[in-house]
């Protein structure tokens, strides 16, 4: 085997963010995050998907096709503790994504979704979808609120089906009691169930009808950024949420299965919805300029939301006061995003607009890392303060539909990866539970020369929130965030996940 470094094909955290699964051109590895260390690996060929089920010994594996046993159409479920294969399932086309919780296993192909009972690996249901080449879907880790969300393609919908409307009147064909034959190479899994879904095609397939036509007096509209919410227990779609104007780039479901976060392909606006009602309860603004969003992740307590993108900066948003007291009509959603994408106004959160009325907020300014002080950041920080005053003044003058443009909260904290190269680096992140940090162990971090920061960090032990980031160039970065002040996250350590 060559001594050259393997190519990374897949990286992900487990559902709790405590482990990392890595698939390379040479094999796969499983790492523990704290303390950091490798606890399982195999050098058996190239792997495209390596998914964990929490911290159990169960792994879902998909190869890259460099050898017959590792076909990209074959899903292999293994037990790492017993070094045994639990089952194998071969699908008609390449597998793009696999998600699991303790009740369900979901396999996404480009035009189909297969849902299995994870305890028996019995095929429960098959969904026909429009092409989903990015393999976008998100699944709730919770069994109590077990949901699957995936993007709905651009389609023509009669106006009687409004945004956030339930779709219980839409009939789904549910896979019967057909047992799936495992360890098979030629038979297509669930093939007999796919033909039964033609009646469902109007909901999941692109509608070729003329968008200007009408049906029974009902006007038609085109939706491009819709998300389908699917209940994995009842095996029924529950809702279509109009998340964005443009194409969906990333999505995530909170640990308890109650919230869904989405980002569009422009990457300027992040929205959070109540997955039960479809109400938009948070809207965050990542930045002014468009960027490619790679991942969205909730903290386990749903207090924070981390967003990674092509800018090599990770933004953390705080889920505090929702927008429920100032809800917007569904028509306002498009107006907000269009303005947010084109506007150069650097807005801030509603809570931050009342600095003068909240002296405790002024006393606890966001922490600023001295090593990241640049002229651009200083100008931006100054403009944010001016924007707060401007937004507060304008909010008293303009009606709700105009002031809604100012309501997108900006990030609570951020971190910049210490990557000097300009090469393309993809990242994913995970937010951990608060931990105690002994400041004496990191004197170079907590004695920055900033008088305000030094005064606040004189405490010997501080409560901090860990932020873990894994990059496609093979590094794990451990940061910590001040849960009270936010600002710049501090890097504690970094490890290579490619070196043995």
From Swiss-Prot:
The modification Phosphoserine is found at residue 354. Pfam families: PROPPIN (PF21032). WD repeats lie at residues 243-283, 288-327. GO terms for biological process: 1-phosphatidyl-1D-myo-inositol 3,5-bisphosphate metabolic process; autophagosome assembly; autophagy of mitochondrion; cytoplasm to vacuole targeting by the Cvt pathway; glycophagy; late endosome to vacuole transport; macroautophagy; nucleophagy. Changing residue 264 to A: Impairs membrane-association. A motif (L/FRRG motif) lies at residues 284-288. Residues 181-194 have a biased composition (Basic and acidic residues). Residues 174-197, 328-358 are annotated as: Disordered. It is found in: Preautophagosomal structure membrane; Vacuole membrane; Endosome membrane. One of its GO terms (molecular function) is phosphatidylinositol-3,5-bisphosphate binding. It is a peripheral membrane protein. GO terms for cellular component: cell periphery; cytosol; endosome; endosome membrane; fungal-type vacuole membrane; PAS complex; phagophore; phagophore assembly site. It comes from the Eukaryota. Keywords: Autophagy, Endosome, Membrane, Phosphoprotein, Protein transport, Repeat, Transport, Vacuole, WD repeat. The 377 first amino acids might form a beta-propeller domain involved in specific binding to phosphatidylinositol 3,5-bisphosphate (PIP2), leading to the association of the protein to the membrane. Association to the membrane can also occur through binding to phosphatidylinositol 3-monophosphate (PI3P). The L/FRRG motif is essential for the cytoplasm to vacuole transport (Cvt) pathway, for the recruitment of ATG8 and ATG16 to the PAS in nutrient-rich medium, and for its recruitment to and dissociation from the PAS under starvation conditions. Component of the PI(3,5)P2 regulatory complex, composed of ATG18, FIG4, FAB1, VAC14 and VAC7. VAC14 nucleates the assembly of the complex and serves as a scaffold. Interacts with ATG2, the ATG2-ATG18 complex being essential for autophagosome formation. Interacts with ATG9. Also interacts with VAC17. Phosphoinositide binding protein that plays a key role in cytoplasm to vacuole transport (Cvt) vesicle formation, pexophagy and starvation-induced autophagy. Component of the PI(3,5)P2 regulatory complex that regulates both the synthesis and turnover of phosphatidylinositol 3,5-bisphosphate (PtdIns(3,5)P2). Involved in correct ATG9 trafficking to the pre-autophagosomal structure. With ATG2, protects ATG8 from ATG4-mediated cleavage. May negatively regulate FAB1 activity by sequestering or masking VAC7 from FAB1. Plays an important role in osmotically-induced vacuole fragmentation. Present with 1560 molecules/cell in log phase SD medium. This is Autophagy-related protein 18.
């Amino acid at each position: 085997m060559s001594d050259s470094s393997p190519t990374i094909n897949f990286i992900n955290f487990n559902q709790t963010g405590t482990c990392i699964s890595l698939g390379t051109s040479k094999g796969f590895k499983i790492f523990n995050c704290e303390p950091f260390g490798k606890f399982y690996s195999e050098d058996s060929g190239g792997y495209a998907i390596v998914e964990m089920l929490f911290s159990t010994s169960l792994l879902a594996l998909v190869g890259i096709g460099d050898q017959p046993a590792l076909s990209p159409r074959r899903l292999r479920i293994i037990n790492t503790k017993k070094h045994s294969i639990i089952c194998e399932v071969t699908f008609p086309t390449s597998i793009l994504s696999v998600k699991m919780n303790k009740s369900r296993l979901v396999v996404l192909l480009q035009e189909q979704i297969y849902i299995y009972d994870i305890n028996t690996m019995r095929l429960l249901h098959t969904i026909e979808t429009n092409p989903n080449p990015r393999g976008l879907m998100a699944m709730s880790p919770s069994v109590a609120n077990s949901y699957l969300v995936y993007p709905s393609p651009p389609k023509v919908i009669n106006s009687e089906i409004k945004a956030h409307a339930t779709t219980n009147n839409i009939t789904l064909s549910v896979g019967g009691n057909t047992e799936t034959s495992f360890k098979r190479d030629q038979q297509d899994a669930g093939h007999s169930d796919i033909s039964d879904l033609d009646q469902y095609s109007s909901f999941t397939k692109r509608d070729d009808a003329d968008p200007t036509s009408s049906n029974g007096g009902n006007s038609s509209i085109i939706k491009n950024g819709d998300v389908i919410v699917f209940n994995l227990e009842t095996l029924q779609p529950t809702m279509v949420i109009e998340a964005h104007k443009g194409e969906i780039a990333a999505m995530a479901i909170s640990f308890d299965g109650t919230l869904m976060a989405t980002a569009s392909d422009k990457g300027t606006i992040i929205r959070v919805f109540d997955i039960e009602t479809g109400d938009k309860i948070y809207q965050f603004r990542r930045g002014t300029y468009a960027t490619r969003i790679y991942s969205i992740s909730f903290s386990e307590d749903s207090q924070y939301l981390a967003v990674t993108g092509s800018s090599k900066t990770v933004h953390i948003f705080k889920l505090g006061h929702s927008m429920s007291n100032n809800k917007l009509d569904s028509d306002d959603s498009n107006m907000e995003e269009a303005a947010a994408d084109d506007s150069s106004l650097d807005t801030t959160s509603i809570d931050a607009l009342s600095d003068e009325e909240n002296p405790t907020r002024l006393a606890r300014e966001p922490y600023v890392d001295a090593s990241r002080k640049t002229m651009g950041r200083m100008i931006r920080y100054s403009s944010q303060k001016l924007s707060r005053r401007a937004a507060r003044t304008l909010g008293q003058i303009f009606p709700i539909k105009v002031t809604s443009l100012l309501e997108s909260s900006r990030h609570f904290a951020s971190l910049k990866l210490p990557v000097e190269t300009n090469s393309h680096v993809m990242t994913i992140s995970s937010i951990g539970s608060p931990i105690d940090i002994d400041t004496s162990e990191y004197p170079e971090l907590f004695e920055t020369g900033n008088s305000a920061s030094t005064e606040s960090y004189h405490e010997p032990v501080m409560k901090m929130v860990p932020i873990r980031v894994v990059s496609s160039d093979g590094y794990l970065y451990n940061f910590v965030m001040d849960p009270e002040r936010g600002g710049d996250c501090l890097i504690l350590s970094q490890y290579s996940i490619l070196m043995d």
